[in-house]
Amino acid sequence: MRAARMAQSTGRQLLRLRGVSSWPGELLGQPRPGPARRPYASGVAQAAVDQSDSQPSEASTREKRANSVSKSFAVGTFKGQLTTDQVFPYPSVLNEDQTQFLKELVGPVTRFFEEVNDAAKNDMLERVEETTMQGLKELGAFGLQVPNELGGVGLCNTQYARLVEIVGMYDLGVGIVLGAHQSIGFKGILLFGTKAQKEKYLPKLASGETIAAFCLTEPSSGSDAASIRSSAVPSPCGKYYTLNGSKIWISNGGLADIFTVFAKTPVTDTATGAVKEKITAFVVERSFGGVTHGPPEKKMGIKASNTAEVYFDGVRVPAENVLGEVGGGFKVAMHILNNGRFGMAAALAGTMKGIIAKAVDHAANRTQFGEKIHNFGLIQEKLARMAMLQYVTESMAYMVSANMDQGSTDFQIEAAISKIFGSEAAWKVTDECIQIMGGMGFMKEPGVERVLRDLRIFRIFEGTNDILRLFVALQGCMDKGKELSGLGNALKNPFGNAGLLLGEAGKQLRRRAGLGSGLSLSGIVHQELSRSGELAVQALEQFATVVEAKLIKHKKDIINEQFLLQRLADSAIDLYAMVVVLSRASRSLSEGHPTAQHEKMLCDSWCIEAAARIRENMTALQSDPQQQELFRNFKSISKALVERGGVVTSNPLGF
């Protein structure tokens, strides 16, 4: 019972990531209680399904739907739609001046990490050397996206991604110091800060004179951010809040002077007068007093970064230091995290690039059995798969950054996918590099073991991959639920909504009959990639068929079906990976890039295997009795382990 409540709570928290309700549509059989409420009754989500009781016209229905249609490709996959606006053609967002400026930065930053920064020494010292920190400040590395007028470099997201890729290639420990500072540490001030807050804090943060940290996680609050216990009580005069609490595992916690802190505050409902505790974000200065930190944590990796517990004891925070709205802290936190995930993918694309170079160097020079080992099929497959994973991650990172630079607001699922994929791909690539290098890879000197240690945290950082998988699946299912709800409402007035009903019904009937939905990437992908484009469309149709069937079966209880949601997320990730490489390789082929044929091979190889994985996953999910037995077994085995306190079976020898 407790597990079920936890699962339901997790599901609802995940669906709050974009500020929407967690209730599926009326067609799914569970209307939300209350006279004026409808499924997904908040913001844009409500607009998607809100219908007048006076049977709306087809025109008004179309208008409402058009105003709320997501441009996200990932959202579209759950609905069986090819939403190509943000993925084709592969975006080129930098103008000539931006490109030239970026080129002028790439050289010095690369040389700095090759000639000045010593990643191995940083790891050994468990801190970044002061000369390195000073050099980074002189490069402007602490304020890459802060506007020029506030002392920063003023980079857009795509320019930022290119420089972060260099950092990730050379030293992930330094990358965490820089990322914890600007990707999340003061990102809230950039996104939500008032003019006064920006002018007061950003110049010194951009120069590196002051360091920032992001304080969300607590001993009792990890993935469930809404369960934080730190509190900020407003003074009777309303001029300040008194902040108490502690935060754990805070990157830059022992270095920071400025903290973005999340705490519960009492908020009065203006309509009812009821007082509820809601999360509020604050900009907190160490100089306020009452802010202390513990010793640096001893960690598996990213040892060069500072990680510490931070304590707030009766800290007086001025009311003007509220970040965003009072009670709006959850939204602030999620926007900060969503906004920064593409940078993680970009950094890890750089990490893989550096690791692949080490693996290739060893394979090209190591002789065994009278042959260079790169001539052996097993090594060739490893290198090829490493290249594919790097290509996909890099393609995702720059796709998302470009979408953001173009002003898109529908990138949350894609950003989460890029973080999941990149962190897992980098681990696989580095693990395989060690395997190719054999015993040498296990030694400290080549530095690959350090990278492997550094990488492990990235599947936990800024939203664990498990939680993000649930977010991807639940957000996609929620949007599909809105569509089903819209169809249900349209059925109340079939004549007034004939166009909508005939279009959707025809598409679904064709899909269910195995005739396809008429979707095609023909004319969108390069003709040399037409076969891979067909594989992507077929995979999307298989995926959408299963999503619809499972939503109709489970209704709102799909939030508890984590075994199912994980498998849906995996396929959504594969689908997005397919389209980003199809898009990038199509551009390279169309523009005649020197590496176009190599990219075609990477793309085709990825699409063949990804389509097979999706087909296998969806076929298994459609074999309902077997899948349900498997899921029941997982639950029972886990329960037995917990009750026993470990492994249940006895040794084969009986003692």
From Swiss-Prot:
Stretches for region Disordered: 22-66
Reaction catalyzed: a very-long-chain 2,3-saturated fatty acyl-CoA + oxidized [electron-transfer flavoprotein] + H(+) = a very-long-chain (2E)-enoyl-CoA + reduced [electron-transfer flavoprotein]; dodecanoyl-CoA + oxidized [electron-transfer flavoprotein] + H(+) = (2E)-dodecenoyl-CoA + reduced [electron-transfer flavoprotein]; tetradecanoyl-CoA + oxidized [electron-transfer flavoprotein] + H(+) = (2E)-tetradecenoyl-CoA + reduced [electron-transfer flavoprotein]; oxidized [electron-transfer flavoprotein] + hexadecanoyl-CoA + H(+) = (2E)-hexadecenoyl-CoA + reduced [electron-transfer flavoprotein]
UniProt entry keywords in alphabetical sequence: Acetylation, FAD, Fatty acid metabolism, Flavoprotein, Lipid metabolism, Membrane, Mitochondrion, Mitochondrion inner membrane, Oxidoreductase, Phosphoprotein, S-nitrosylation, Transit peptide
A GO CC annotation given for this chain: mitochondrial inner membrane
Post-translational modification: S-nitrosylation at Cys-237 in liver improves catalytic efficiency.
Modified residues (Phosphoserine): S517, S522
Annotated EC: 1.3.8.9
Bilayer topology annotation: Peripheral membrane protein
Modified residues (N6-succinyllysine): K71, K195, K239, K276, K278, K331, K372, K482, K556, K639
Pfam family, one: Acyl-CoA_dh_M
Transit peptide per record: 1-40
Cell location: Mitochondrion inner membrane
GO function terms (MF aspect): acyl-CoA dehydrogenase activity; fatty-acyl-CoA binding; flavin adenine dinucleotide binding; identical protein binding; very-long-chain fatty acyl-CoA dehydrogenase activity
Region (Catalytic): 41-482
Co-factor(s): FAD
Record has Iron as a keyword: no
SUPFAM superfamilies: Acyl-CoA dehydrogenase C-terminal domain-like, Acyl-CoA dehydrogenase NM domain-like
Subunit organization: Homodimer. Homodimerizes after import into the mitochondrion.
Similarity field: Belongs to the acyl-CoA dehydrogenase family.
Protein name per the record: Very long-chain specific acyl-CoA dehydrogenase, mitochondrial
